[in-house]
Amino acid sequence: MSASTTATLRHDWTLAEVKALFVQPFNDLLFQAQTVHRAHFDANRVQVSTLLSIKTGACPEDCKYCPQSGHYNTGLEKEKLLEVQKVLEEAARAKAIGSTRFCMGAAWKHPSAKDMPYVLEMVKGVKAMGLETCMTLGRLDQDQTEALAKAGLDYYNHNLDTSPEFYGNIITTRTYSERLQTLAYVRDAGMKICSGGILGMGESLDDRAGLLIQLANLPEHPESVPINMLVKVAGTPLENAEEVDPFDFIRMLAVARILMPQSHVRLSAGREAMNEQMQALAFFAGANSIFYGDKLLTTANPQADKDMQLFARLGIQPEAREEHADEVHQAAIEQALVEQKSSEQFYNAAV
């Protein structure tokens, strides 16, 4: 094996090392990932979160994968920021169906001064229910980050999406360094980080490895690493992107597990398209977190009862809140708003 299964925490991974992990025989890679996983987690427990879109559509960013972008005509109905009481009602529903974390996402480049008081009240209200809280609101400045931390926010999601080299092909309205700066503000404020990326945007193996290197070589590993499979949405520039090979997706999860052994690896956007066998293989590769409920943020997600039925067949138990924590991923939020059920507010992603 090309990396130690003892999985001491490292922050100095090289491209050659990570590519060597990717290209080793599939069974060897999965064995290594499962060995690392068992050294740090109960292999038969998966963390469960629920994700709610608190403000949908009309985002000024031009992310080519995202149906929420105001640059593309995807038929998505725009919505204003939800009222605080509505958010709290949805959080209560999430707790009732077994979620331990409630993740709130807004389609913003960054939160405005007029919206921040409402966002802070949402955090306080959800926290008072005994749920862990997470948000993805776009870029933050230092004052906003500190205000969220003071309100009790546990996790902040801000995805890197892809490698620095490929990033400019996907997004031009926010720089990679701005994303890294937001993550630094979040960490400095004492909150936990959720950050990952998306497969299927035309990136190379070097780009996939490069994304994981960026995450693993941060001063502290993200507590949650969502790995998303592109959900292709009509009207976005990536609607005709080439499909991701399922084995390549599983390899990405396995390498993420090896590089960041103590992080929750979330099986995120795109799970609706995965059959049960692929999801089971994902859990074996080290994925130990999913989003649970009706939807991703704007894309379909397996129904909650189907998730629990699969868990039962695999002998997997939902992770209790006290045991570990994970976080929401923004790519899920940004990743697709295709089958919007008017009667439901939940959006799920999995990782």
UniProtKB/Swiss-Prot annotation:
Q: Which HAMAP family match?
A: BioB
> What is this protein's gene name?
bioB
Q: What is this protein called?
A: Biotin synthase
The function of this protein is:
Catalyzes the conversion of dethiobiotin (DTB) to biotin by the insertion of a sulfur atom into dethiobiotin via a radical-based mechanism.
> What's the EC number here?
2.8.1.6
Q: PANTHER family, from UniProt?
A: BIOTIN SYNTHASE, BIOTIN SYNTHASE, MITOCHONDRIAL
Q: How is the cofactor bound?
A: Binds 1 [4Fe-4S] cluster. The cluster is coordinated with 3 cysteines and an exchangeable S-adenosyl-L-methionine.
Q: Catalytic activity, per the record?
A: (4R,5S)-dethiobiotin + (sulfur carrier)-SH + 2 reduced [2Fe-2S]-[ferredoxin] + 2 S-adenosyl-L-methionine = (sulfur carrier)-H + biotin + 2 5'-deoxyadenosine + 2 L-methionine + 2 oxidized [2Fe-2S]-[ferredoxin]
According to its UniProt entry, this protein's organism is Pseudomonas fluorescens (strain ATCC BAA-477 / NRRL B-23932 / Pf-5)
Complex and partners? Homodimer.
